[in-house]
Amino acid sequence: MASSQVGDMVNGNAEPTRHLAKFPPSLWGDRFTSFTLDKQLWDKYGNEIEVLKEQVRSMVVAGGRKAAEQINLINVLERLGVSYHFEKEIEEQLEQLFAKFEDNEDYDLFTIALHFRIFRQHGYKMSCDVFNKFRDSNCEFKETVSNDVQGMLSLYEATYLKIRGEGFLDEAHAFTIAQLESLVEGPHLSSDLSEQVMHALKQSIHRGFPRLEAKHFISFYEKDASRNETLLRLAKLDFNQLQLSHREELCHIFRWWKELDLISKVPYARDRAVECFFWSTCAYYEPQHSVGRAGLTKIMLLLSVTDDTYDAYGTYNELKLYTNAVQRWDVSAMDELPDYMKALYRALLNVYDEVERDLAKQGRAYGVHHSKEAFKEIVRSYEIEAEWFKEGYVASFEEYMKNALVTSTGRLHTTSCFMGLEADVATTEAFEWILTKPKMVAASGAIGRLVDDVMSHDEEQERGHVATGLDCYMKQHGVSKQEAIVELYKMIENAWRDINEEMLKPTAISMKLLIRVLNLSRISDVVYKYVDGYTHPEIIKDHVISLFEDPIPM
């Protein structure tokens, strides 16, 4: 979160006191600087994948399967991480299944909850009234379903698709957590099922990083006696082939970042090339988005250093100069900047030029202008926070959030992510939609801002920092820190409800775009769930290694 941590020089030309953040260094050394893609292995995977894809496509479109079986097949494809190969076929099937759905009395809780989750994930608004038959006259869950671990687990995952006004799903969420925790502690679950439940309680499907969750599910599915070997084989091959591609991309990014050598000129900043690529891969992991991933990663890296400049190094006067330079977006503005800022400013202009050239080759450069404007907006808001800090000003919570929804990077990340999508998906209308400040982008930004405020609060206040949302709420409402945290988490949950509702049909823009906003929101849940995993990358180190280094045994 950006804010000036220091005042200006005390007198004359004396060097100002700078309250450095002392961020942890990069974990990776030269670990990702070299990688040679095994083209023979990549081709071998690819050839078998193409054969298996046709077999699975035939499964998806084949008739004669009961609705519950078809929904389960779609669920397995999604959880194995291979549904992106069959998007058209799956959407056609779901449209038919939703139109024909009947609340069959024979459907158990697992099946009803699975229908609910899959339909809502794809924009179909199934009513939560479908769960009424599992409650007694006192509106409590019947005992027969309370001890059904598969049913409870399915309902638990379904509750994450709730929207505003669905109090039943709030109750169901709390109830299923309590039941699942109790069942895990009991003696009746197999070790495999217990492991699956514990993972779900730690990370839900809906809010998880799709590629990481696919890898987890593959390990569970492999132990399932009813598994389909064709699906399992496809999932393993697909994960490993895509991992090779991602590793090669990461190597290119890592070398580019090392050659840029910006950190040596701004050593106060977080060195997070690998983590930014991890972030970008969550936004879109599919192989056709390699150019987009590279562009998004580079922009995120420059934003990260800019954030740290405002947050943990620059004086107020220096920051004003930098804000003005970014608004001008012209190399001549560099002359007015201190030396360390010149390096950052030059890198910023060059990165956007690189990204624009790469996208121009594919006829998609028109989005770059929107990303630049979003970057300018963030820097203006960073300066507002720097002024607040200099003046010791604690904003009202509403005033804080108005500015924080900009510094949360929701607009910039969404715009920069859209730049890397196909031209017929990320149209000029899509970028204009972002300019309307849509509820979904605001909700995504609120999630990121508020969860970061909670998780990084103590550390930031220890070194001196502008008042965060937590501080503003505490002062305005006269409540304790813990009480404020409870209220902020209520806001986070409401933001998730808004995201879910914005993804229900009819949607404002293509679902292919909205899923990217959802993915950007998921990053906050994964990276900031227990601590600020971006500032402290050891928290997500295992995720990075799992995603980019460790293949799935064949």
From Swiss-Prot:
One Gene Ontology MF term: carbon-oxygen lyase activity, acting on phosphates
Binding of Mg(2+) 3, residues: D452, S456, E460
SUPFAM superfamilies per the UniProt record, alphabetical: Terpenoid cyclases/Protein prenyltransferases (SSF48239), Terpenoid synthases (SSF48576)
Residues at which Mg(2+) 2 binds: D307, D311
UniProt remark on cofactor binding: Binds 3 Mg(2+) ions per subunit.
Example of a GO biological process term: sesquiterpenoid biosynthetic process
Catalytic activity: (2E,6E)-farnesyl diphosphate + H2O = valerianol + diphosphate
Superkingdom: Eukaryota
Keywords recorded for this protein, A-Z: Lyase, Magnesium, Metal-binding
Enzyme Commission number, as recorded: 4.2.3.204
Enzyme class, UniProt record, top EC level: lyase
Motif DDXXD motif location, chain numbering: 326-330
Pathway: Secondary metabolite biosynthesis; terpenoid biosynthesis
Free-text comment about domains: The Asp-Asp-Xaa-Xaa-Asp/Glu (DDXXD/E) motif is important for the catalytic activity, presumably through binding to Mg(2+).
General function of this protein: Terpene synthase that catalyzes the biosynthesis of the terpene valerianol, which is a volatile compound of floral scent.
Protein name: Valerianol synthase TPS1C
Biological source species: Camellia hiemalis
Gene: TPS1C
